[in-house]
Regions:
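Short beta-strand/turn micro-motifs composed of small residues
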Residues: 8, 48-51, 154
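Residue-level signal for short, function-critical loop segments
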Residues: 10, 50, 126-128
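Substrate-binding N-lobe of the ribokinase-like
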Residues: 3, 17-84, 88-93, 100-105
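Positively charged, low-complexity intrinsically disordered leader regions
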Residues: 1-17
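Ribokinase/PfkB-type carbohydrate-kinase core domain
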Residues: 2-5, 62, 70, 92-159
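Short, glycine/acidic-enriched loop or turn micro-motifs at the edges of active sites
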Residues: 12, 16, 52, 156
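Acidic active-site catalytic centers that drive phospho-/nucleotidyl reactions
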Residues: 9, 13, 32, 153
Length: 159
C-alpha cells in the first residue's frame, strides 16, 4: 500500500485571543497536512525534531493520537522544542512570534523505508533552511532514487 512520508518542522502554537492564552496545539506547515491524512487512515510517517522536554512530549503524543508514526522524530537532548505565540486579531488573523533553540546536530534520524510511488512531502522554509540543507538533500535524493513521488508545498501565506 502506498504511504506518505513527510519532513518538516513541528512547533507548539500557543494561541492568544484578546492578549490572553486561549489554547495550545501542535502545528507546522507539513505537519498540519500529515495530521489530516493520518486522521483519514492514510499510513503516514513524519521526519522531524523536537526537544526531549514537556513540549516535545505534547507534540509526540498528538502525533500518535492522530496516527502519525514518530519513529523518525529526533528527540534531541540539547535545546528546546520550538514554540510559537499566535496573537489573533478581531478577524482571527494571526501575528506570530517564534521561540526556537535547536542543537547543532539536527535531524539525527535514520532514513525511512520509502518504496516506489510512495509520496514524499516537504515544504516551507524548513526545507530551505541552510542549517538543514545537507540533510534535506540526502532525504530528497534517497526518496528520488526509490522512485517516490516528490511533493513540495511552499506554504505561501497572504501577506
Amino acid at each position: 500500500m502506498r504511504k506518505v512520508i513527510g519532513i518538516g518542522e513541528t512547533i507548539l502554537d500557543i494561541i492568544f485571543r484578546n492578549n490572553r492564552p486561549h489554547t495550545a496545539v501542535p502545528g507546522g506547515s507539513t505537519f498540519n497536512g500529515l495530521i489530516s491524512l493520518g486522521r483519514l487512515g492514510v499510513p503516514v510517517s513524519f521526519i522531524s525534531e523536537v526537544g526531549n522536554d514537556r513540549v516535545g512530549d505534547i507534540i509526540r503524543d498528538f502525533m500518535m493520537e492522530n496516527n502519525l508514526s514518530t519513529r523518525y522524530v529526533d528527540r534531541f537532548p540539547d535545546g528546546k522544542s520550538p514554540i510559537s505565540l499566535a496573537f489573533l486579531d478581531d478577524d482571527s488573523n494571526a501575528n506570530y512570534t517564534f521561540y526556537k533553540e535547536y542543537p547543532k546536530q539536527r535531524l539525527d534520524v535514520p532514513m525511512p523505508e520509502i518504496n516506489e510511488d510512495d509520496i514524499f512531502i516537504y515544504g516551507s522554509y524548513y526545507s530551505l533552511n541552510p542549517a538543514l540543507r545537507g540533510r534535506m538533500v540526502e532525504f530528497l535524493n534517497y526518496a528520488r532514487q526509490r522512485k517516490a513521488i516528490l511533493y513540495y508545498d511552499p506554504n505561501f501565506r497572504k501577506a
